[in-house]
């Protein structure tokens, strides 16, 4: 049994690259980490073929919070958070994965500060903190939006 981490975003857009950064820097037993760029739907077949019990999606999300704050975003609140770089809305992707695979999907948003010149210090600190939370499996440390 394993879990899958999907890092979503675009590094060319500053803080929008935090999901990709987390995916590239996360390694832990029982996890498969995938850098999805801005197209997590391209990995639907891989997720379906896996024995994953949990899928965690990490992305920059405009939630109206201070830069670097992170939240678990329930599926009924996805519309309240802004995700600007995806071709398919994350809500549709998540619903499809849950219905076809029957896995638990957790969406973690990190509030961006800026969308230019690399990942900002506050957002990078949040990404590093999230790596540790993922390794511990202690999702309860993250507030729900």
Where are these regions (language model features)?
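N-terminal catalytic or cofactor-binding beta/alpha core of small enzyme domains
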Residues: 1-112, 117-145
């Amino acid at each position: 049994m394993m879990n899958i981490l999907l890092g979503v975003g675009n590094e060319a857009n500053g803080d929008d690259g935090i999901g990709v950064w987390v995916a590239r820097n996360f390694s832990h037993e029982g996890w498969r980490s995938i850098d999805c760029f801005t197209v997590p739907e391209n990995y639907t077949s891989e997720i379906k073929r896996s024995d994953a019990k949990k899928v965690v999606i990490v992305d920059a999300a405009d939630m109206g919070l201070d830069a670097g704050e992170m939240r678990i975003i329930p599926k009924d609140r996805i519309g309240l958070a802004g995700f600007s770089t995806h071709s398919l809305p994350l809500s549709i992707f998540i619903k499809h994965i849950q219905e076809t695979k029957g896995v638990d999907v957790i969406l973690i948003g990190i509030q961006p500060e800026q969308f230019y010149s690399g990942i900002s210090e506050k957002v990078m600190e949040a990404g590093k903190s999230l790596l540790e939370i993922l390794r511990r499996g202690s999702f309860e440390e993250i507030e729900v939006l």
